[in-house]
């Protein structure tokens, strides 16, 4: 069946995180992202999970580029290994993704994002499932101005701590992907914020891995709640389970978040 190289869809999440395409093929892809002070946060320190947007895209689009023209990939699971601190100085980050395996219904991809100095900040493994679609996603029109660089990620997404360990993401066009659902990378970011809230973090902890299963789409036009449960708390490592529940009251994502002290706090 015919395959068509997809347009890189600049959804709300891509605009918010300043993500752009360099190259997209059925075997490899490269994207870029502008860093900035919006990644800093008083609770999570610097949002490492926000790298999930570019990493989800750079691996997911490899599967999309090799899929039949009436199929589109959605993520079943993403594992992020978060190795370093995203810079906040305006430097450009580069992400690369590559195909590991593909069949008629799914694809597996891996990738990484590196800083301008060549240091690896994060790794991803993604498993995707192909859906039959009447038309592939296209770049949506958003009539709300993109938040400026002085607006933090927490503020731009209007993330709100309901109580310790419970964080709410209201309806927000800048949380969405091209299909109108909450972007996988934004869901992962919510997982990070909820996990840190449950631990009572104040900038001294960092997420080192986030392993997320996506069990159903989350409509970006409705609120999503992230509820965290601490499974282990220790001086060297803590483990938190986070469940994201969509507006229909059903889980849309379940994650295990591993947290360690920030390097300067060890």
Describe the predicted segments one by one.
Residues 61, 73, 86-148, 216-221, ...:
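HotDog/MaoC-like acyl-thioester-processing domains
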Residues 43-46, 60-94, 99, 195-225, ...:
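Hydrophobic beta-strand-centered segment that forms part of the acyl-chain substrate-binding groove
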